Design a protein with these regions (language model features):
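Short, basic amphipathic alpha-helical segments that act as recognition/interaction helices
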Residues: 29-57, 94-121
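Short, positively charged interaction helices/loops
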Residues: 46-84, 112-127
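Surface-exposed, Lys/Arg-rich phosphate-binding patches that contact polyanionic backbones
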Residues: 12-37, 60-62, 76-101, 124-125
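Intrinsically disordered, low-complexity serine/threonine- and proline-rich regulatory segments
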Residues: 1-6
Length: 127
């Protein structure tokens, strides 16, 4: 599968945000999700957000470089959606949206668009 690969660093607070977003996305799908799959789902949610400006503003506060390194893998088939999310975010900033900021926006969107209460996980009835 052809993909675009981005590698960047961020602060430990964003690492915690990513860990929780992955957990929430995994609970929602009932599968172990990767950081890339979680970010892509967040970008999808962001594109449909009622208030994308609020997500961008919140993400800008969290967009801090640091020592934690991540590799984000975007399949070429999803690159247009990824770019569309960055373009939407750019409407609310005075500069191009760097990949790290797009990543933080996506993680926040997972929280705002998936579960409000992530403690509930549907459990199938025993056979």
């Amino acid at each position: 599968m052809s993909q675009v690969i981005y590698t960047f660093t961020f602060d430990k607070s964003v690492f915690r945000l990513a860990s929780h977003a992955i957990r929430i996305h995994s609970h929602h799908t009932l599968a172990f999700e990767s950081v890339s799959a979680t970010a892509l789902k967040g970008m999808e949610i962001f594109l449909c957000a009622e208030d994308p400006k609020a997500l961008v503003e919140e993400a800008q506060e969290l967009d801090i470089p640091g020592d934690v390194r991540v590799t984000l893998r975007i399949p070429l088939s999803q690159k247009p959606m990824f770019q569309q999310a960055r373009d939407l975010a750019m409407r609310y900033t005075d500069h191009p949206v760097p990949i790290r900021l797009a990543f933080v926006i996506a993680l926040l969107a997972v929280f705002h668009g998936t579960f409000k209460d992530c403690s509930y996980v549907p459990i199938a009835e025993p056979d």
